[in-house]
Amino acid sequence: MARSKTSHNWLKEHFDDKYVKMAQKDGYRSRASYKLLEIQEKDKIIRPGMTVIDLGAAPGGWSQVTSRLIGGQGRLIASDILEMDSIPDVTFIQGDFTEDAILEQILEAVGNTQVDLVISDMAPNMSGLSAVDMPRAMFLCELALDLAGRVLRPGGDFLIKVFQGEGFDIYHKDIRKLFDKVQMRKPSSSRDRSREQYLLARGFRGIDGAASIERF
C-alpha cells in the first residue's frame, strides 16, 4: 500500500526535526527527553538520590534523563502500556494504567518509600475529535494525580502533560488545593502545532490538607 501524502509529510518532518537528530546523536530514545531536560534546567525538579515515578514512560526518553540525574542512590519506577527496553536500575511495570491491577503493582513497587516526584508524559491515542480526546486525556490526568496524592511525600512535586480544553480548569483548581505552587511550562522542544503543555505542581501539602481526588 502506498504511503499517504500526510504520512509522507509526517515522516519528512520527523527526520528533519532537530530534536530527533539531537536524540540520535546524544543517545536518547526520543525527542521527548529534551522537554524534560529543558524543564529540569529551569526548575531543578530532579536531584541525586530522589525516588521518582515515571508514567507513560515508553520508549524511555524521560526515564533515561531521570535515571542519570538521580544517580545510583536514587530509585526510579517507570510504567507504560507499551513495552520499553530495559534501563539499568529502573523498575519497569508494563500495563494499562487505567486498570486497578497496574496501579497496585506500582504501589507495591513503591512499598513504604515516600516518593519525591511523579512525572507523567501520558496521552491517549488522539482521534482528532476534541469531544473524544479531551475526556480521555483528562481521565489519565486524574488517575496520575490520584497516584501522586497516594505516594508523594509532603513537599513533593508533580509534573504532567496536559491539554487545555473541557475539564482542564477544574483539574487545575484541584491541583492548586493540593500543592503550594502551580505553573505551566511549554518547552521549546514541544512542537508548535501541539496543544500539549506541562503542568508543574510543587510543594505537595498532603491529602489531609485538601479534598482527596478519587480514582474513577
UniProtKB/Swiss-Prot annotation:
Native source organism of the sequence: Pseudomonas syringae pv. tomato (strain ATCC BAA-871 / DC3000)
InterPro entries, sorted: RNA_methyltr_RlmE, RNA_MeTrfase_FtsJ_dom, rRNA-MeTfrase_E, SAM-dependent_MTases_sf
Main localization (coarse): cytoplasm
Alphabetized GO MF terms: rRNA (uridine-2'-O-)-methyltransferase activity
Compartments, as annotated in UniProt: Cytoplasm
Residues reported to bind S-adenosyl-L-methionine: 60, 62, 80, 96, 121
Function: Specifically methylates the uridine in position 2552 of 23S rRNA at the 2'-O position of the ribose in the fully assembled 50S ribosomal subunit.
UniProt-listed NCBIfam families: PRK11188.1
Active-site positions on this chain: 161
E.C. number: 2.1.1.166
Keywords: Cytoplasm, Methyltransferase, rRNA processing, S-adenosyl-L-methionine, Transferase
Protein's UniProt name: Ribosomal RNA large subunit methyltransferase E
Keyword Transmembrane helix: no
Listed GO CC annotations: cytoplasm
Family (UniProt): Belongs to the class I-like SAM-binding methyltransferase superfamily. RNA methyltransferase RlmE family.
Catalysed reactions, as listed in the record: uridine(2552) in 23S rRNA + S-adenosyl-L-methionine = 2'-O-methyluridine(2552) in 23S rRNA + S-adenosyl-L-homocysteine + H(+)
